[in-house]
């Protein structure tokens, strides 16, 4: 045996290996393993099609298994009303299995590709007129999370949230992405360079905190 070279690792990450399961069967198998293995599970839900399907599958399986889940939804303020209505409808549909629904309406910064004059967008920015008001039960208090810093980026927030949610114990943040949408998304799952939660679970990614 010889050590796997970088080129070999890259090639192994490029090619898909068909499984004997279809996508739905594989997703249910992975979600079931997660619910059975980890004591705390949170679905990252954007209101879009991929994360919406992930929430449906996870909540339905949790209901069948008598488990509870949490949901993270980051409200970007300038969102379509139909998206907000959809988020609210799923929240109500699975209220029996959702232990905590973290509806985030805090100032967060992200890239803005819609303006040449404002390359970054900060939702819920203090002292400006908002596009719409957040729900009454949304998290708007900057002191709710010990890690929160005003205007922190979306990427920083989700990393810190995952660490906070884990409570320094094994936990899962569930995301729904389709590898066919882009090569970057495929590599995010298939890469051999990432740290996995378990060696035989290549679809997992381990965070430094162990979740």
Kindly label every feature range from the protein language model:
Residues 2-211:
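ATP-dependent adenylation/nucleotidyltransferase module used to activate substrates
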């Amino acid at each position: 045996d010889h050590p796997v070279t970088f080129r070999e690792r890259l090639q192994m990450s490029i090619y898909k290996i068909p499984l004997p399961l279809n996508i739905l069967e594989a997703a249910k198998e992975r979600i079931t393993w997660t619910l059975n293995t980890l004591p705390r599970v949170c679905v990252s839900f954007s209101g879009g099609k991929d994360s919406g399907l992930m929430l449906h599958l996870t909540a339905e399986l949790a209901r069948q298994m008598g488990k509870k889940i949490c949901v993270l939804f980051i409200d970007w303020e300038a969102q379509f009303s139909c998206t907000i209505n959809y988020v609210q409808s799923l929240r109500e549909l699975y209220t029996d299995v959702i232990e905590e629904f973290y509806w985030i309406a805090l100032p967060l910064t992200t890239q803005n590709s819609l303006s040449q004059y404002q390359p970054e967008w900060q939702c819920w920015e203090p002292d400006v007129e908002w596009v719409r008001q957040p729900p009454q039960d949304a998290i708007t208090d900057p002191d709710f999370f010990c890690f929160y810093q005003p205007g922190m980026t979306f990427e920083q927030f989700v990393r810190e949230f995952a660490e906070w949610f884990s409570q320094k114990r094994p936990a899962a943040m569930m995301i729904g992405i389709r590898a066919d949408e882009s090569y970057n998304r495929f590599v995010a799952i298939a890469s051999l360079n990432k740290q996995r939660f378990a060696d035989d679970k290549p679809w997992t990614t381990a965070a430094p905190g162990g979740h």
